[in-house]
C-alpha cells in the first residue's frame, strides 16, 4: 500500500515537523585540499567591511593594519565594522546600571581563577598552532614545546606551574631581541641491508638550533593558523577557522573566564548554559514579554541573523569593553586582560598549505606554498584566484597575512555575547523613553528579538531603532535573513519555539548508533543516548523501543557478535557458538559475547553487566571481571566515563555514561608507524611526560591528590611527600631504621641536584 507522506503531517503543527527539514542524516561534507583560498576570502572580506578605516603600520613587524573604529557610519545596509567607541562604552555603562555590581563581582571571581589556574589548562583543546615547528600539533605537545623553548632561553617563571606565570614568560619573550628554537628535521641515507643485501632508505631524526630575530618571533607569536571547518551541514561553501598559538591562548582564556562570569548573570544570554537549562532561561524571557503585552500591546519576535558577525567585530572594541569592565580593579589584572585584544589587533593569519597544481599532460603535481604567493607570476591562476591574490598581496609577510580588524571564528564567544546583550538591555522603557520596548536572547552571533508596542508603527520604529543601535556597535543585523513573526513562534540557536520549545529530534540523529570506542563503552553509550532522548527530546516509547532494537542489531553487526543460536556466519561465530554451548545460563551472556538482549525502555539506566550479573555462570563472572585478567585495562576505571558526542551543531559534547570494567573495556594500541617519521621526537617527549606523570601518581594516589595551590614544582612536592610517608612508615614500624635513613638521604641528594641545576 502506498502512503501519501503529506498525510503524516495533517495533525502536526508545522513547527513539530521541523525535524524533517534538517540536513542531518547521512555523512556531513568534509573538505579536501588546502584551506588557503577560504582563508584569503576571510582576510579580504574583513578588510572590505572596514575599508574606510585608517591604515597604519605596525612598528615591530612592519605589517600594514586597518583600523575602522570610530570610522564613518554606513549610509546603506552594507555590513560594516565601524563600531563607535563612545557608544560601546555607554552600552556597557547602561548594562552595569541595570545590573548593579555585575562587573565588579565578575572581576573578583575571575581574579580568583587567574591566581589558581594551572598551566595544564592549556593542554585542553585539539589542534593548536605550534610556533616552534610552524604547523599544527595536539595542544599538549604544542604547550610542551613552547615551555621547552622558553626554558632554554632562560624564561623560567613557568616552572611554578601557574598559568599566570607562564604568561609572564610570554610577555617577556616578546621583549627579547632573539629567541632560540629547536627544529626537527629528517636525514635520509641509502644503506645496504645486511640480511637481504638490498639498498634501503634509512631515516634519522636530527634536531638543530635555530635563532629567530625579534620580528620573526613576534610574527609567529601573533599568528593564527587556519584550517577548513569540517562537517558543516547545510552549506555549499566551506569556510576557514583559526587555531591560535600558545602565546595567545592563555590570555584569551582569562578574558573568556571574565566574560563567562558576566554572561551567567545576564538573563538574556544563551551562553554558557545549554540544553534544558538554556530552554528554561529563554522561556522566561518570552513569558515576561507575553504577560506584559496581553491587553494593550502587540508583541512580535524577530528570528535574527547577523551578517558576518566575526568579521565585523573588532578587537579594539573588546579592549574598550575590558577597560570599562575592569575600571576599579588592580593594575596587574587590567593588564593581563587587555593583552588578548591587543594581540588580536596585531594578529597575522597563516594562509595554510598553499595551492596544488597539476599538469594533466605531464601527470605532474606540485604545491605552491603560501610563502610564494607574494611574488609568483599570476598567469598560472584562474581569474577568481588571481583577484584574491592581488587583493591580499599588500598584506603578506612571510606567508602570513596581516589581519588587524575582525575576530576569527569562536575566539571570544562570551565577550561578544556581552556586547550583544548590552543592546538588548537598552530596550527597557526607561532607555527607549517611548511607547515601544524590546528584550531578547543572545548567544554568540545568534539572536532573537522580542518587540512590544501599542501598534504596528511602534513595532516598526522599535525594530528600526534596534537595527541602528546595532550598527553603532559594529553589529549588522541582516534584513534579508531575519524574519519577524507574532511572538510565540521563533527559532533561536536551532531551538524552535512554538508556545514552548519543540523537540528538534533530527539534531540528535548523528549520535545514534555505535560509537566505536570499544564493546563495553559502545553498549553503554548507545542505550544512554536513547535514554537521554526520551528525557529531553520527545522520543516516544514506541520509537525508543524501535531505536533500541535497531541499535542492538547495528551493534551485533559492528562487533560480529550475533546470538549464539543464530545461523549468521561471521569470523567470530565459531568462538561465540562454543561459549554459548558451554554456558548454563545463556541469558547471562553479554550481547557482545553472543548473549540475548535484555534491555527494554524501562531499564536503560542500568549497565549491562549489572543487569545480567545475577544471571551469569560463576566462571563467566570470574573471567569477565577478574582484575588479574590480562585483557582488562586497569588504567583508570571511573564509575562514570565521558564519551565525546558530536551533536549536529555546536562543539563536541561530553556525554556521561556508566562504565563497568570488564574484558570488553579494551583500549586499542597506538599505531607504531609514527616511529619512522619526523614526529618521533614528539613521541619520545610524550613518553617522558607519561613516565613523569606515572611517577607523580605513585606518590599521590588519586584519593589524596589535590592540585597544589602553593608554588611548588612536581619534584619538590614528591620529595616532601616521600619524607612525610617515610616518617609515618618508620614510626609505625612498617620500615626499618636503615630504610628510613636511605630514603632521607635520597631526598637530600635530589634537592642538591636541583640546586646545582
UniProtKB/Swiss-Prot annotation:
Post-translational modifications reported in the UniProt record: Phosphorylated by host PRKCA.
Keyword Nucleotide-binding: yes
Catalytic reaction list: RNA(n) + a ribonucleoside 5'-triphosphate = RNA(n+1) + diphosphate
Compartments where found: Host nucleus; Host cytoplasm
GO cellular component, one term: host cell cytoplasm
Region (Promoter-binding site): 249-256
Enzyme nomenclature, EC number: 2.7.7.48
Pfam families, A to Z: Flu_PB1 (PF00602)
Residue numbers covered by motif Nuclear localization signal: 187-195, 203-216
MF terms in GO: nucleotide binding; RNA binding; RNA-directed RNA polymerase activity
Occurrences of domain RdRp catalytic (ranges): 286-483
InterPro entries linked to this entry: RNA-dir_pol_NSvirus (IPR007099), RNA_pol_PB1_influenza (IPR001407)
Main location: host cell
Keywords from the UniProt entry: Eukaryotic host gene expression shutoff by virus, Eukaryotic host transcription shutoff by virus, Host cytoplasm, Host gene expression shutoff by virus, Host nucleus, Host-virus interaction, Inhibition of host RNA polymerase II by virus, Nucleotide-binding, Nucleotidyltransferase, Phosphoprotein, RNA-directed RNA polymerase, Transferase, Viral RNA replication, Viral transcription
Keyword check for Nucleotide-binding: yes
GO biological process, one term: viral RNA genome replication
Region (Disordered): 53-82
Role: RNA-dependent RNA polymerase which is responsible for replication and transcription of virus RNA segments. The transcription of viral mRNAs occurs by a unique mechanism called cap-snatching. 5' methylated caps of cellular mRNAs are cleaved after 10-13 nucleotides by PA. In turn, these short capped RNAs are used as primers by PB1 for transcription of viral mRNAs. During virus replication, PB1 initiates RNA synthesis and copy vRNA into complementary RNA (cRNA) which in turn serves as a template for the production of more vRNAs.
Protein family according to the UniProt entry: Belongs to the influenza viruses polymerase PB1 family.
Subunit structure, interactors included: Influenza RNA polymerase is composed of three subunits: PB1, PB2 and PA. Interacts (via N-terminus) with PA (via C-terminus). Interacts (via C-terminus) with PB2 (via N-terminus); this interaction is essential for transcription initiation. Interacts (via C-terminus) with human PKP2 (via N-terminus); the interaction competitively inhibits the interaction between the RNA polymerase subunits PB1 and PB2.
Name used for this protein in its record: RNA-directed RNA polymerase catalytic subunit
Taxonomic classification: Viruses, Riboviria, Orthornavirae, Negarnaviricota, Polyploviricotina
